């Protein structure tokens, strides 16, 4: 049974509101009010799996707030819906921002405004969050502190902006369509992309069919931003395929949860890439 997307988003409202002017008490109370005490939280390395809102706050948010006492959470896109399997998910992306004044996870503070992109997904049952799958772009913060230990990224560095259309935070009534056509478009695109290189040259991907000629690809830190089809290929896809030419949409042993609204599609899984 599907649930209206706006009702799903409302479950997250305590956190979204507390993030405007974050404090330890505000974030802690927000998580406690919207999450099951037994919620499974799957965080990126080095945090790993965490049980419950209190432990999540202690492991992740409390140290971040000590490093950035004026922390704020800036949502860019929030998408909600029910998957084909009947699960209810809310997907969010945005930037954590604040003045970086104290060390965090061994990263030396800059004393300046810093930002860290996040992608967080929340599974909801009976009006509360029962699972979280989240990635914080910690390398992005390392680069701002000039503490990146690996090779320079090929793409550009940029604090990810909101969509040009400025409609990533719309309510359900404002979205045009239910997203099914958009999701089908994305899935077809991914299938075509996986035809290269095993089934032919770059032309078999039909990239111009799916992408605007002036699109931006906002890769994670370590890869960076590319402009247009050529930028995507030069700074991400070609180096990626040289390293992992056998990547494919292989569902074996992996999970994938898709929801879409209007022109927006989000997908998560833990794990969902091999």
Question: Where are each of the predicted segments found?
Answer:
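C-terminal and inter-domain tail/linker signature
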Residues: 1-274
């Amino acid at each position: 049974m599907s649930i209206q997307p706006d009702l799903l988003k409302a479950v997250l409202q305590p956190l979204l509101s507390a993030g405007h002017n974050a404090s330890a008490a505000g974030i802690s109370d927000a998580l406690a009010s919207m999450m099951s005490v037994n919620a499974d939280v799957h965080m990126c390395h080095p945090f790993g799996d965490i049980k419950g809102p209190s432990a999540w706050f202690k492991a992740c948010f409390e140290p971040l707030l000590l490093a950035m006492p004026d922390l704020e959470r800036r949502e860019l896109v929030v998408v909600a819906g029910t998957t084909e399997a009947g699960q209810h998910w809310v997907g969010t992306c945005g930037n954590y921002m604040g003045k970086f004044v104290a060390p965090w996870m061994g990263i030396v503070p800059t004393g300046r405004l810093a930002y860290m992109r996040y992608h967080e997904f929340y599974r909801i049952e009976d009006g509360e969050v029962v699972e979280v799958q989240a990635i914080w772009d910690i390398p992005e913060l390392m680069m701002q502190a000039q503490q990146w230990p690996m090779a320079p990224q090929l793409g550009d560095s940029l604090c990810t902006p909101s969509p040009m259309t400025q409609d990533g935070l719309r309510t359900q009534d404002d979205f045009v369509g239910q997203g099914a056509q958009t999701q089908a478009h994305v899935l077809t695109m991914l299938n075509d992309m996986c035809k290269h290189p095993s089934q032919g040259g770059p032309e078999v991907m039909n990239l111009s069919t799916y992408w605007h000629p002036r699109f931006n690809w906002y890769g994670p830190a370590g890869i960076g931003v590319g402009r247009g089809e050529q930028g995507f290929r030069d700074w991400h896809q070609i180096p990626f395929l040289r390293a992992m030419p056998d990547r494919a949409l292989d569902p074996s042993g992996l999970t994938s949860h898709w929801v879409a609204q209007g022109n927006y599609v989000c997908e998560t899984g833990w794990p969902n890439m091999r």
